Design a protein with these regions (language model features):
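Conserved catalytic-core segment of NTP-binding enzymes
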Residues: 162-163, 169-267
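Phosphate-binding loop that captures ATP/GTP phosphates
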Residues: 80-140, 146-154, 158
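Extreme N-terminal, non-catalytic leader segments
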Residues: 2-59, 106
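Glycine-rich phosphate-binding loops of nucleotide-dependent enzymes
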Residues: 126, 168, 181, 289
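C-terminal boundary of histidine-terminating zinc-finger modules
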Residues: 270-281
Length: 299
């Protein structure tokens, strides 16, 4: 047998071995998946006293999702109906809600041994940032993370809450899957910036919620433009109308078009959100209109 024929013979047999190996594994995985699907999803537990649960999510980090979550919560709380609102920060490894909301105290325990949300500006907050020291890193594996999330979710006395705003970590991982399968979610808001790299992840986020049967309330285009404070020239630093076009493509509603405003940065860093520090500013009015769209929907 020639060297060329020998190589062909071995390549053919090795290829067939791999095909048999992987097709065998695929068959096993397929059967396992079918068995799990027959069992059905875990039964969802209601959150006592909570009427609406809204997830604030993003396909990638750095799009201002937590800023959107904080200011939306405050804007809903300031609607004429005087809704009772709380924020749950589920970003275990990088919680930012305590800084933005200027809350530092550990939650107290109520008579039922459940945590009481730490309240500021009329909005209750629960976050991992309130349960560990500020300089302490959370270095946990999946099961511990899920345990902590369940503790914050079901181990908190939410009282009579009209809207629970859940600030989720970026991406489409276990935390999103767990929240959507264990509690009744009223809807999800997806946050994106206009540039293509962020929009590409929006599709994944919307697809994830569609697969989990979670209603997507709409898309928020954040950091859409920058208005110069000296000459009032508007600059689209990350492209123009990218998220708006994405919303049209996906058939979902564009809930808000939020500009880059220095007030949002300074107010967030100081722990006095713009809805509190500058309630009559143009960007605060954008959030009020956004909140009105959420509250006017039948959830």
């Amino acid at each position: 047998m020639s060297l060329r024929a020998l190589k062909t013979f071995y390549n053919f047999n090795i290829g067939n071995c791999f095909k048999r190996l992987y097709s065998s594994k695929d068959d096993v995985l397929k059967r396992r998946q079918e068995e799990l699907m027959k069992r059905g999803l875990p039964k969802k537990k209601p959150l006592e006293g909570v009427k609406n649960v809204i997830l604030i999510s993003s396909g990638k980090g750095g799009v201002g999702k937590s800023t959107v979550a904080v200011n939306l919560a405050l804007a809903i709380a300031r609607q004429p109906q005087a809704f009772k609102v709380s924020i749950l920060d589920t970003d275990i490894f990088g919680p930012s809600i305590p800084i933005m909301m200027n809350v530092n105290d550990s939650p107290l325990l109520g008579d039922n041994d459940k945590m009481l949300p730490v309240t500021n500006y009329g909005v209750g907050c629960i976050s991992m940032g309130l349960l560990v020291k500020e300089e302490q890193a959370v270095v946990w594996r999946g099961p511990m993370v899920m345990g902590a999330l369940n503790k914050m979710l079901f181990g908190t006395d939410w009282g009579d809450t009209d809207y629970l705003i859940v600030d989720t970590p970026p991406g489409t991982g276990d935390i999103h899957l767990s929240r959507s399968q264990t509690i009744g979610v009223s809807g999800a808001v997806v946050v994106s910036t206009p540039q293509a790299v962020a929009r590409a992840d929006v599709r994944k986020g919307v697809d994830m919620y569609n697969k989990m049967g979670v209603r997507v309330l709409g898309l928020v285009q954040n950091m859409s433009s920058f208005l110069c404070t000296n000459c009032s020239h508007k600059t689209h630093m990350f492209g123009e109308d990218g998220a708006r076009l994405m919303a049209e493509e996906l058939g979902i509603r564009l809930l808000a078009d939020i500009p880059m405003d220095p007030l949002l940065v300074t107010s967030g860093d100081s722990g006095v959100p713009v809805l509190v520090s500058h309630p009559e500013s143009s960007v605060a009015k954008v959030y009020k209109d956004f909140a009105n769209k959420i509250c006017s929907q039948k959830l």
